[in-house]
A protein has these predicted regions:
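N-terminal glycine-/serine-/threonine-rich beta1-alpha1-beta2 phosphate-ribose binding loop
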Residues: 4-126
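Conserved active-site and cofactor/substrate-binding residues in soluble primary-metabolism enzymes
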Residues: 21, 25, 45, 64, ...
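Short, ordered loop/turn segments at secondary-structure junctions
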Residues: 55, 136-137, 162-164, 329
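Rossmann-fold NAD(P)-binding glycine/threonine-rich loop
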Residues: 109-126, 136-160, 172-173
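A short hydrophobic/small-residue beta-strand
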Residues: 131-132
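Rossmann-like NAD(P)H-binding beta-loop-alpha module
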Residues: 151-219, 230, 238
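Substrate-binding/catalytic subdomain of NAD(P)-dependent oxidoreductase enzymes
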Residues: 199, 210-305, 313
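ATP-dependent carboxylate/acyl-activation modules
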Residues: 303-354
Length: 354
């Protein structure tokens, strides 16, 4: 086990809750970089548990073979019950009983409550375990509680992947903007609606775009969380809570989705030299109150937010560094996995430094 202040070769045991796209991408990156981590950090990172909701779990107190885990999941969509490392443990069983140092919260999102992922994180932090979350739900609904619990138990709590995959928004705010005051955030945070609005500019109806997206496998069967603005509202909430210390929840965001947008609206905006984007805006006002809004807006074609190549973009308004903008031009599974991976490295670096 790696403990704070240790600089000798040690093990960092990782428990993974969920093994979907982000989990498998993390596993691949970890396999590729394992030797380099040992060389540069003196730490042997070992995954000892992987859980899923209905596809079985794996556990080995020494270390799991991640290549084999991915093979099983890719070939059959579940873990092999005949495997010596197969387990019936649930995510909460692992969180409460297994010997690990870091838990990766990668379970499916519940955008309306943040559960059960919040319970997983809460129990891990109570045990003094470090947490890396790719799940935005707990941060959107219970950020302050979990942040304070992490501090009380001297545990790391990182969540880079929750908003813009591996794009280092929180890392920049935490480490590169120290002593800066951030009172305003704006951006485009939902890739699905960004894609839909771009396709509608080609005179394709929303219904046809959704149908093609579902048939192509790159859009959820139920994309209402995207089109109604819930996903964007949750991401804006996470940004405002973590960067602006806002202490709000998604239901407090003034939210309007894109379901009411028509191709006529798109064309009318174009005639005015504008494009329509689902914009996210969060602000702290002079009286200390905070407000957040998600809604379709007309954006000038010359604006950075109008760039059709963008998947997502966020601007932070600071008192000392002015306006800083981070742009994401592609959305690959590697980026999502990298966000989880680099948060795990941050855990190691924090422990070694302290």
């Amino acid at each position: 086990m790696l403990r704070k202040g240790d600089r000798k070769m040690k093990q960092l045991k990782v428990a993974m809750l969920g093994y979907g796209i982000a989990g498998r991408a993390f596993a691949e990156i970890l396999d590729q970089t394992h030797a380099e981590i040992m060389k540069t950090r003196g730490v042997d990172v070992r995954v000892v548990a992987i859980t899923t909701g209905s596809r079985g779990s794996l556990y080995c107190m020494d270390s799991l073979n991640l290549t084999e885990a991915t093979r099983q999941m890719t070939e059959s969509g579940k873990f092999d019950k005949s495997s010596p490392t197969f387990s019936s443990m649930s995510s909460m069983d692992v969180v409460k009983t297994v010997d690990y140092d870091v838990v990766l919260e990668l379970t499916p999102l519940n955008i309306f409550t943040g559960l059960p992922a919040t319970d997983h994180i809460r129990e891990a932090l109570k045990r003094g375990k470090h947490v890396v979350s790719a799940n935005k739900g707990p941060l959107a609904w219970h950020y302050k509680e979990l942040r304070d619990l992490a501090k009380a138990n001297n545990a790391c709590f990182f969540f880079e992947t929750t908003v813009m995959a591996g794009t280092p928004v929180f890392n920049m705010a935490d480490n590169c903007l120290q002593f800066c005051k951030i009172d305003k955030i704006e951006g485009i945070l939902n890739a699905t609606t960004n894609y839909i609005l771009k396709e509608m500019s080609k005179d394709i109806s929303l219904e046809d775009i959704m149908r093609a997206g579902r048939e192509g496998g790159f859009m959820e069967a139920d994309a209402s969380m995207d089109t109604e603005g819930w996903d964007a509202a949750a991401k804006l909430t996470v940004l405002m809570n973590a960067i602006m210390d806002a202490d709000i929840t998604p239901d407090l965001i003034d939210r309007t989705g894109i379901n009411g947008i028509t191709t006529d609206d798109i064309n009318d905006a174009k005639a005015r030299g504008n494009v329509i984007k689902l914009m996210c805006r969060g602000e702290r006002h002079a009286d200390g109150t905070v407000t957040g809004k998600v809604a379709p807006e007309e954006v000038p074609e010359s604006d950075v937010f109008a760039d059709e190549r963008l998947v997502a973009v966020v601007s932070l308004y600071t008192d000392l560094m002015g306006k800083l903008t981070m742009m994401q031009y592609g959305l690959e599974t590697t980026q999502t996995g990298y966000g989880v991976f680099i948060d795990t490295i941050r855990v190691i670096d924090t422990i070694i430094r302290d």
